[in-house]
């Protein structure tokens, strides 16, 4: 486990990261932990794997430098990709979606011949038959990505047989981040707690969240954030939930052909109207034969194509080729 320990130790000790790796359980950090779990130690030999950080000091001259970039071009941690000197010191940049790679090539002029796409992955989710007494919605991503709009839409719908479960908190990125940003969303969380048919759970560890997803019907996500992949959507689809979201960022790439995807409207008012229509349609048609047939195919395909059984082979092959 010497090589894996080296990779994790470097991530843990990287003080230039905006959040502590050890304390953070966001999508990128969780993906690195799962990669470490599913690959043999020898795969990481002579590899310097850098997660979401373009700090020059992280380059190691005696190793193959691989930047694993989950961030959109507007994130501070990606900004140094504008430096040709830094990019020249990298051997490879791994992106989590075609959309994200294309944006980086366009914005930073990243050489195509040193960039590759390896999609995110999940551990397979066993299917549990959904309850039929009511429709349960879930929002299980960070609060700034669309929770305010969802809460407004949910209030306007005012449906007695529909419950909204909110699993959202800034603590997901650790104490330092929570201390800095937590107060910003306190009023929104309080609104969740005081809204009819809404249950606020805060941060849920992934194991608990997966068990909750199995009982949910719809991932209600009016995304206002340029997702570069969206693990929350992948896990929801694998658990048999219908995903109702926007086409912002890589969501179309991630959720097609199964998700109910609406065009992202630039004003909140327009987005609320369009999203309300789409969500209501999804609620009303959830138990239809067509929807159930689609969701069965969805969970089978997503569990198959996004499984670490598949992705670990891709990573092993990539590292082997990178060493040649």
Predicted features and spans:
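Short hydrophobic beta-strand element within catalytic cores of glycosyltransferases
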Residues: 242-245
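Conserved donor-binding/catalytic core segment of Leloir-type glycosyltransferases
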Residues: 129-146, 151-154, 164-165
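N-terminal pre-catalytic "stem/leader" segment of glycosyltransferase-like enzymes
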Residues: 1-54
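A charged, aromatic-enriched C-terminal amphipathic alpha-helix characteristic of glycosyltransferases
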Residues: 25-30, 266, 270-273, 287-323
């Amino acid at each position: 486990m010497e090589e894996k320990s080296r990779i994790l130790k470097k991530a843990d000790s990287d003080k230039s990261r905006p959040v502590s790796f050890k304390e953070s359980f966001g999508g990128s950090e969780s993906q690195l932990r799962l990669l470490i779990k599913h690959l043999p130690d020898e795969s990481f030999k002579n590899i310097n794997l850098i997660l979401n950080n373009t700090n020059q000091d992280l380059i190691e001259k005696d190793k193959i430098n691989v930047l694993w970039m989950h961030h959109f071009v507007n994130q501070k941690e990606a900004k140094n990709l504008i430096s040709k000197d830094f990019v020249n010191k990298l051997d490879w940049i791994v992106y989590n979606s075609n959309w994200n790679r294309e944006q980086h090539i366009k914005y930073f002029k990243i050489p195509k011949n040193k960039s590759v796409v390896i999609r995110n992955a999940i551990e397979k989710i066993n299917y549990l038959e959904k309850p039929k007494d009511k429709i349960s919605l879930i929002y299980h991503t960070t609060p700034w990505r669309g929770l305010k709009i969802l809460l407004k839409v949910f209030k306007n719908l005012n449906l007695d047989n529909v419950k909204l479960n909110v699993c959202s908190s800034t603590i997901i990125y650790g104490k330092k981040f929570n201390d800095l940003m937590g107060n910003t969303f306190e009023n929104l969380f309080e609104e969740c707690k005081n809204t009819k048919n809404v249950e606020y759970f805060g941060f849920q560890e992934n194991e608990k969240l997966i068990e909750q997803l199995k009982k949910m019907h719809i991932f209600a996500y009016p995304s206002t954030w340029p997702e570069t992949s969206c693990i929350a959507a992948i896990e929801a689809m694998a658990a048999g939930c219908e995903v109702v979201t926007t086409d912002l960022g890589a969501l179309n790439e991630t959720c097609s052909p199964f998700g109910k995807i609406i065009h992202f409207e630039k004003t909140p008012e327009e987005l609320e109207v369009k999203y309300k229509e789409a969500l209501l349609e999804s609620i009303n048609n959830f138990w239809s034969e067509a929807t159930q047939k689609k969701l069965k195919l969805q969970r089978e395909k997503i569990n198959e194509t996004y499984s670490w059984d598949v992705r670990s082979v891709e990573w092993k092959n990539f590292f082997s080729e990178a060493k040649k």
